[in-house]
């Protein structure tokens, strides 16, 4: 008897059925893997088929032999309406999802996973963002777009800020949201330190559940205004910060259950959805105050938490209409990005989540090895998308398709962006060439290319001024 690991359990279960005649008598097989990783089964026989005890006993023996300590010693079968297991069976049927290896032949294979945390990353069921993709494509609602990086230090937040500025300068109405609650930073780009800042997301999530309608997001939405940066004296950039990082911030953060965001008993999920709806209304009202004709929000850009954090998973997989994901040419980066791309393929949804891939920190023009790295990143991206993003029923695009989702947008490493960027210092930009240079970089070709491709995802044009 050989010990096995967690990663081998599903394969071992399949081996047990390949070696047993019981497979021909079943309509479906559901593998239930509990929080410890132990395996139990729910078997549904074909109509008018009764599974004999001797066959079930042989299956039990095989499961014990192959799964060893990972076998949970339970095989459940459908029973009559009065059976005590009925509620359990109903839960299994409602929560299970098709197994990745299921080919829709008999018997069907299903999986039901039990988790302690990371539901946002492991949830395989189809979900809906705060408003449907259809109304976004029709231009009736803003597109919610998450900026995500598996590793830190790749310029994600800076790229989000640059994209927001680029979109705004071309006539789009944009709002920025700092969802990186454990490492907030968006606020410092746009505003100086204050003795007392406006409340942010962390306050909304706590106060809304206590105060209800008495706590309105519109009273706490910051507005950044700068003609040099936004291209129009009447244009603003609404910003919802993470919150004021003061002596109470950690106490507030400690009261948010981010590990069970998809749990039906966790009120936060609905609060999140309500927040985006309030944000859309509040930002639109701010635009109308400046210009009655410009009262509609086009984009909401979310800065998310690095890595497999529950909140980052919730943002890109549950709330967003698209995601911008960042990677570097390294094994570490591709190991994580592969799983992110696999998750966002949404195998049970009609379509995968639209993605844009950023090749971050790429060598600059003239740096030795640049072309080799760019080529290798493109090749790896195509391979990962081919294996994990496109469904078996889709035709995979040609590897040279520069507008396809796997084709990376290259953002070179910029020494000028290494220092802290304070956009609120730009009030006298014409007198300071170094600050003017920063503006040129943040609204330069790579970010224009990103903004243009982002607009195309939603059937929009980048330049609305012409």
Regions from the PLM with identified roles:
Residues 145-147, 238-241, 301-303, 355-361, ...:
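Extended hydrophobic secondary-structure segments that form protein cores and membrane-embedded regions
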Residues 229-239, 296, 351-353, 402-407:
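A short helix-to-beta-strand connector/capping loop
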Residues 2-135, 346-466:
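C-terminal lobe/tail of nucleotide-utilizing enzymes
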Residues 131-132, 137-183, 187-189:
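Walker A/P-loop phosphate-binding motif and the immediately C-terminal alpha-helix
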Residues 51-57, 61-63, 170, 273-396, ...:
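Conserved catalytic-core segment of NTP-binding enzymes
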Residues 6, 156, 264-275, 332-336, ...:
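Phosphate/oxyanion-binding active-site loops and adjacent basic polyanion-contact surfaces
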Residues 181-292:
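P-loop/Walker-type NTP enzyme "switch/lid" segment
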Residues 149-151, 181-183, 244, 306, ...:
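Short, flexible loop/turn elements at secondary-structure junctions
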């Amino acid at each position: 008897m050989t010990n096995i690991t967690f990663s081998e359990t599903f394969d071992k279960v399949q081996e047990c059925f390949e070696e047993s005649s019981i497979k021909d008598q079943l309509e479906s097989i559901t593998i239930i893997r509990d929080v410890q990783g132990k395996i139990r089964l729910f078997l549904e026989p074909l109509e008018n088929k009764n599974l004999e005890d001797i066959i079930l006993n042989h299956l039990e023996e095989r499961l014990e032999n192959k799964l060893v300590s990972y076998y949970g010693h339970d095989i459940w079968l459908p029973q009559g309406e009065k059976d005590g297991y009925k509620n359990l069976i109903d839960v299994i049927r409602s929560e299970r999802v098709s197994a990745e290896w299921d080919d829709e032949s008999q018997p069907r294979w299903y999986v039901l996973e039990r988790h302690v945390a990371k539901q946002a990353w492991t949830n395989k069921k189809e979900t809906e963002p705060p408003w449907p993709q259809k109304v976004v494509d029709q231009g009736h609602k803003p597109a919610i777009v998450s900026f995500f990086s598996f590793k830190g230090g790749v310029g994600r937040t800076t790229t989000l800020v640059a994209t927001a500025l680029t979109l705004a300068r071309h006539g789009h109405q944009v709002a920025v949201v700092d969802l990186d609650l454990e490492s907030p930073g968006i606020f410092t780009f746009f505003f100086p330190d204050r003795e007392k800042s406006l409340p942010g997301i962390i306050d909304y999530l706590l106060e809304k559940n206590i105060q209800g309608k008495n706590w309105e997001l519109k009273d706490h939405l910051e507005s950044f205004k700068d003609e040099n940066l936004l291209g129009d004296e009447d244009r603003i950039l609404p910003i919802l910060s993470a919150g004021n990082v003061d002596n109470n911030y950690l106490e507030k953060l400690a009261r948010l259950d981010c590990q069970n965001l998809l749990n039906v008993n966790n009120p936060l999920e609905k609060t999140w959805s309500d927040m985006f709806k309030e944000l859309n209304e509040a930002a639109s009202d701010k635009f109308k105050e400046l210009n009655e004709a410009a009262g509609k929000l086009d984009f909401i850009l979310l800065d998310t938490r690095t890595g497999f954090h529950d909140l980052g998973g919730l943002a890109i997989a549950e709330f967003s209409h698209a995601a911008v994901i960042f990677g570097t040419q390294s094994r570490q980066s591709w190991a994580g990005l592969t799983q992110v791309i696999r998750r966002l393929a949404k195998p049970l949804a009609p379509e995968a989540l639209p993605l844009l891939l950023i090749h971050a920190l790429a060598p600059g023009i003239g740096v030795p090895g640049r072309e080799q790295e760019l080529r290798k990143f493109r090749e790896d991206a195509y391979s990962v998308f081919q294996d994990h993003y496109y469904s078996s029923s889709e035709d995979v695009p040609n590897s040279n398709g520069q507008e396809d989702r796997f084709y990376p947008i290259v953002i070179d490493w910029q020494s000028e962006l290494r220092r802290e960027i304070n956009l609120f210092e730009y009030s006298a930009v014409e007198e300071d060439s170094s600050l003017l240079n920063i503006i040129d970089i943040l609204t330069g070709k790579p970010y224009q290319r990103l903004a243009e491709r982002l607009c195309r995802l939603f059937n929009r044009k980048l330049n609305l001024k012409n």
